[in-house]
């Protein structure tokens, strides 16, 4: 069997709270090949593996995916899901794909930068994207910076490689 726990700030979180999934069991891997630092970051000495997924557990023990921990943008004291921003803005018919990342702000936290790839033959601009964001997102979740790009980097599995967008 596999054990699962939802952790936040060093403790198991209560139902309804968002926390990180950790798993432990005989089929959980023992570490990354030739990457001891990464293994130490994600595999606790007692065998609990930190998956990097943030979820909320309800009273019936069902888990609801929130986002990947690496996709959290810290802005004005709030944890904001980059995936939520990407989904909301990416629904614009003239946007082929987009990706939000956190960039350093003068306040020591992060501002939201959104990289946007336009669909071929469209005339979308950062101003249009800003106006759309006002319709779709609360003020705290709206990108401060919008840059139009020809393409976004992807991983081998064709997911957007946000880590390659970081300045």
Place the predicted regions along the sequence by residue:
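A structured beta-alpha segment of the ubiquitous adenosine-cofactor-binding alpha/beta core
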Residues: 47
């Amino acid at each position: 069997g596999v054990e699962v726990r939802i952790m936040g700030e060093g403790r198991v979180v209560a139902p309804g709270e968002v926390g990180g999934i950790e798993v432990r069991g005989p089929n959980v891997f023992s570490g990354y090949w030739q990457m001891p630092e990464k293994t130490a970051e994600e595999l606790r000495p007692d065998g609990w593996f930190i998956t990097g997924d943030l979820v909320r557990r309800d009273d019936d023990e069902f888990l609801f995916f929130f986002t990947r921990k690496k996709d959290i943008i810290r802005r004005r004291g709030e944890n904001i899901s980059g995936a939520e921003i990407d989904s909301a803005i990416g629904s614009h018919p003239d946007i082929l794909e987009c990706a939000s990342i956190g960039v350093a702000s003068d306040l020591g936290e992060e501002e939201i930068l959104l990289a946007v790839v336009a669909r071929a033959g469209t005339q979308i601009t950062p101003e249009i994207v800003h106006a759309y964001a006002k319709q779709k997102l609360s003020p705290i979740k709206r990108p401060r910076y919008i840059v139009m790009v020809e393409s976004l980097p992807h991983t081998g599995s064709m997911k957007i490689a946000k880590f390659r967008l970081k300045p």
